[in-house]
Amino acid sequence: MNSTNSGPPDSGSATGVVPTPDEIASLLQVEHLLDQRWPETRIDPSLTRISALMDLLGSPQRSYPSIHIAGTNGKTSVARMVDALVTALHRRTGRTTSPHLQSPVERISIDGKPISPAQYVATYREIEPLVALIDQQSQASAGKGGPAMSKFEVLTAMAFAAFADAPVDVAVVEVGMGGRWDATNVINAPVAVITPISIDHVDYLGADIAGIAGEKAGIITRAPDGSPDTVAVIGRQVPKVMEVLLAESVRADASVAREDSEFAVLRRQIAVGGQVLQLQGLGGVYSDIYLPLHGEHQAHNAVLALASVEAFFGAGAQRQLDGDAVRAGFAAVTSPGRLERMRSAPTVFIDAAHNPAGASALAQTLAHEFDFRFLVGVLSVLGDKDVDGILAALEPVFDSVVVTHNGSPRALDVEALALAAGERFGPDRVRTAENLRDAIDVATSLVDDAAADPDVAGDAFSRTGIVITGSVVTAGAARTLFGRDPQ
């Protein structure tokens, strides 16, 4: 695959400093240690361990206010938009998101950039003795042999400690999974953001959407005495979910701002490299906003982020955020792995869609914002996902699909994915490849052949494309193959 680079990603380039081999080795060692703990997909409904660790660390999460983001789809994009807006308003930010695409350092960002491998390792080593103490206490608790701290709990503690050390003015905190029992819920955020909720992580959160909403609504917490009410900023939801979220907001005495009621997307126009928006915020109308991301769903993410930042700064009917700062913030937004272009001629996109809702948003964007005449999907999906739902959403926009394996032990094997794809696409439209690199080569051959077809030719390669999708792991692995640095 001549157009890609198979070397390891430069885990520190986003900071402007290239990490040394020793620093990379230390980072890998820390990751190995963290991987010995409970994985992020395993939930124990308790905040006892993370709360105890925060107490030992001096409650770093209380040293700055936070904007807390839960939901099913769009959390990371909203978090990155909030980060960019707050930065444009001259506040120092810390941001923690999950999972990472390429390097674990992406999970902890300060001033909009991932911390360096050296900082990541130093932060872990700083809290490591206290983590060991909590492990011992938990395992000895009441003689029951409780669990040690999970990987995500330790990562969350690292982020909160790094933010306090920086120090930051505002933390932008994305929930890992769920909300109520998520390790991030040791904060008491003045602004709780809920992106659209759908069914995902069925093995861990269940298949009852009202129950899922109840878990995610757990981040809407009562404000401390003497503080302004918490504000719940809620994106578009189905009625059953909205009912749960509003009930939780009442319980927490939280003010509520809902999309299409208190804020809305008024207008969007497709533009080169993204879209131009007119948004109704809590403080008024913001016009001529260029967002360098594709898709109607990103416009809704943008207005959700705007309302969240307005709520944080107290904007409302009598006070609007600075319009130039808002425009500058949105113009600076990046969201790696979200319909991100890797190359042109033929066009290659990667997208981290990993559930039916995400796949539907991807398909809608491809159908409405591009003029492809022949499009090939490269697909690897994790085995615990709704594979058929993802395939059903993508089938109308992909002429062919190449199914493969992204290297994750959780990924569905190629044979099983090919069988599922054949049922949706028909066997003639399905190809297989053992690994992602080979799959991209197969897809490239397919678009080369299509470009030579007189029914497609005219704009040739500009009318053919490849989309690599199916999971965050797939998008991250592809990003590394194309030589992109972690962001």
UniProtKB/Swiss-Prot annotation:
Pathway connected to this protein: Cofactor biosynthesis; tetrahydrofolate biosynthesis; 7,8-dihydrofolate from 2-amino-4-hydroxy-6-hydroxymethyl-7,8-dihydropteridine diphosphate and 4-aminobenzoate: step 2/2; Cofactor biosynthesis; tetrahydrofolylpolyglutamate biosynthesis
Cofactor(s) the protein needs: Mg(2+)
Chain positions recorded as Mg(2+) 1 binding sites: 76, 98, 174
Alphabetic keyword roster: Antibiotic resistance, ATP-binding, Folate biosynthesis, Ligase, Magnesium, Metal-binding, Nucleotide-binding
CC annotations in GO: cytoplasm
Effect of inactivating the gene: Cells lacking this gene display impaired growth.
Enzyme Commission number: 6.3.2.12, 6.3.2.17
SUPFAM superfamilies linked: MurD-like peptide ligases, catalytic domain, MurD-like peptide ligases, peptide-binding domain
Family per record: Belongs to the folylpolyglutamate synthase family.
Protein name, entry field: Dihydrofolate synthase/folylpolyglutamate synthase
Native species: Mycobacterium tuberculosis (strain ATCC 25618 / H37Rv)
Lineage, uppermost ranks: Bacteria, Bacillati, Actinomycetota, Actinomycetes, Mycobacteriales
Gene: folC
